[in-house]
């Protein structure tokens, strides 16, 4: 992503993800806020997931981890990521080359980075100076 879109990619060594010809799923010019009508997308790998800045989801994706912990079994195998301006933390499920679900699971002020402990539990670092642990709500 850049000025119009945010994206999540499945990384393949040597893969061409279209930077700076593409923003998300849209062709773009060298001006970061300008879309173009078309571009050469030969050999480019499309994002696994993308969202536009104009759809209200946010404007700055913060990459995370695939959840492999034991405390939040409902998230097992989901890719956890955040969006900085919206404070949303989401769980993205991608299977059979398609997004199966993308659910907001938490809100963290100014998410800056993710971390993972030796048990696979995920933590979120905030620009507010705190580290947040993801925990199940009572009864879940």
What are these regions (language model features)?
Residues 1-100, 134-137:
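Beta-propeller domain segments
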Residues 11-12, 45, 105-108, 124, ...:
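Weak global preference for isoleucine
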Residues 61, 98-118:
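Conserved blade-ending motifs and adjacent loop-strand segments that build the rim/top face
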Residues 113-140:
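Blade-level signature of beta-propeller repeat domains, shared across WD40, Kelch, NHL, RCC1
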């Amino acid at each position: 992503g850049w000025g119009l879109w945010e994206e999540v990619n499945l990384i393949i060594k040597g893969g061409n993800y279209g930077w700076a010809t593409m923003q998300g799923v849209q062709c773009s010019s060298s001006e970061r806020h300008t879309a173009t009508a078309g571009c050469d997308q030969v050999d480019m790998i499309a994002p696994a997931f993308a969202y536009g800045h104009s759809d209200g989801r946010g404007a700055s994706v913060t990459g995370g981890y695939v959840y492999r912990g034991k405390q939040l079994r409902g998230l097992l195998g989901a890719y956890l990521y955040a969006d900085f301006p919206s404070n949303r933390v989401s769980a993205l499920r991608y299977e059979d080359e398609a997004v199966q679900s993308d659910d907001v699971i938490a809100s963290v002020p100014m998410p800056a980075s993710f971390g993972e402990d030796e048990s696979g539990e995920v933590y979120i670092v905030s620009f507010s100076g705190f580290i947040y642990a993801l925990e199940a709500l009572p009864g879940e």
